[in-house]
Structure formats: structure tokens, C-alpha cells
Amino acid sequence: PRELFTECYGKRISLDEDVTRNMAKIVDYVRMDENGLSLRNAIIEKYILISNKKELGDRIIDILRYVSRYVSERRNDIWYIIFQCLLKEDILENRLKLKKNDIKRIYFSVKKEYEAISYYWLQLGLYEQKVNDFVASYNYLEMSASIRPNSYKIQHALARNYLRHANYVMDYNEAKELFAEGEARMKNLIESKEFYKEKAKPFSINSYILEKIRYIQKFNIDPDKKEL
């Protein structure tokens, strides 16, 4: 985003300045559009990510700390979007290809700056869920819910954490109790008549069916006709 570039560099650098080697200009590598600054070539982007792999985690931490002064709960502006993109567990792992230990280091390095933000705890909870630490995930998701109790995404994450935990443990009695709790929570979300939850209902239905099938197959359960 151009706001981040301007905040960091002000007017010290112009897109038309000769600031790179061999008389090349910034404009040869980046462009400005309605979305802000972006690289002109995907190959350049890939090269930057690969060649700076070891520094990537530190640079993300630096930016997150830098923008933290502008980020607050329920303030959906450009700074909050930057914060969300850089903290999103799925982006860190699948797009930026960071290792799980590096992702965890990022989260805990910015805890002080974002401990009052529900999205921080949500992503930390989803990370712990990804590494199968469902107890830690539950605790972090509860922290997120304590800040934003009516958030659909947070309540969905809590419900699915129970379901995934049930499908992870080997003891049937423990799994049965966990799944029952997660199932009740997920059904409450699915059956809710609130509009903002209605929009995400298909996602919850899909998640519930997926975990239900896994549960039935893992413990060789014969579902009754009502469940089918």
C-alpha cells in the first residue's frame, strides 16, 4: 500500500529517481495503481522472496511493529488490512512459505503490540490448531472471543477446534465428548437467523460435514437415518 511506503520514506524517494544500479529507475521495477505500489514482474517478486528467505520473518516483524501504532480493534482501514495480511496464518505458510517455527516466532514477537486485538488471537489460535495443539488453540480463541464475542469467524473457529480435536485423539470416549460440544456449537451457528452469520453458513456446513465424515470413519460409527 502506498500509505506504508509514504509513511516509511516520505518524499525522500520518487518513482522517477535514479536510485538503482546501471541507471535503472524504481519505475522500471514497480508501478503505482489504485491498489498502491506493486512489482511489475512476478519473477522479481519470487526472486526477492527466495533471496531474502532468512530475513523474511524479521522484516515481517519489523513492519508489524511499525504499523501497530495505527491498528486498533474494529478500525477497518488500510493499516488494519496490512496487519491482517501480514499476520494471516494461511498467507505466512502457503504464500510466503515460512516454516511453522518461524510463524510462531512472528506471532510471539508482536504479542505486546497486538494483545488487545481479537484478530491476533484468532490467527494464533488457528496456528496452534494447524500444529494439533488444540488446548492451546482453544485458549487463544477464547482470548479472541473475549474481545469480540459476537464474531462469526471466532465462534466458527472455536466450534471446529472441538471437532478437529475429537478427530485427533485416539480414545473414543474423549472424542465423543469433544465432538458433541463442537457439533452443538457448529449447529448453533448454522441454524442462526442473524444476517451476518447467514452469509457464512455454507462454510460452516461444509466444515461440519467434513469433520463428521472423518469422525464416523475413524471410529467406525454407523450413523442413523436422521444423521444421514
Describe the predicted segments one by one.
Residues 107-108, 141, 179, 186:
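Hydrophobic/aromatic packing residues within the alpha-helices of TPR/SEL1-like helical repeat arrays
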Residues 2-128, 134-135, 144:
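C-terminal leucine-rich, beta-strand-based interaction scaffolds used for sensing/assembly
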Residues 97, 131, 165, 169-172, ...:
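Structural motif corresponding to the intra-repeat A-B loop/turn of tetratricopeptide repeats
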Residues 123, 157-160, 164, 205-214:
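"A position-specific structural signal for the A-helix of alpha-solenoid helical repeats
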Residues 120, 154, 195-202:
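TPR alpha-solenoid repeat register
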Residues 114-115, 149, 194-195:
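Short coil turns that delineate tetratricopeptide repeat
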Residues 90, 128, 162, 169, ...:
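Residue at a conserved register position within TPR or TPR-like alpha-solenoid repeats
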